[in-house]
């Protein structure tokens, strides 16, 4: 298990999380990093990419096609209001929204395992 502190870049936690989740849930879950941001076109106009408040990592889980969203923060990091709103929207639509600030096992692996078992019971 990796140890993270406030100086650990979110990108390091994201990469570790994606590797761990991909190995543990190899046949049940596909996840990917969301790239958001902004750039300027040739005329100098700003073009924004992504959805406001969108989580850092998205995915889809078998057997029901459950939407997965994972917001990653450094230890002690706080969500912005639009991130909380996005998370609530995902939950309201039956998806899974998780916040991870470094404890990948407790904050991501365990909740995904529980949801996978629940979803499997639904189709039995």
Where on the chain are the PLM-derived regions?
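Catalytic phosphate/metal-binding cores of nucleic-acid and nucleotide-processing enzymes, i.e., regions
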Residues: 1-124
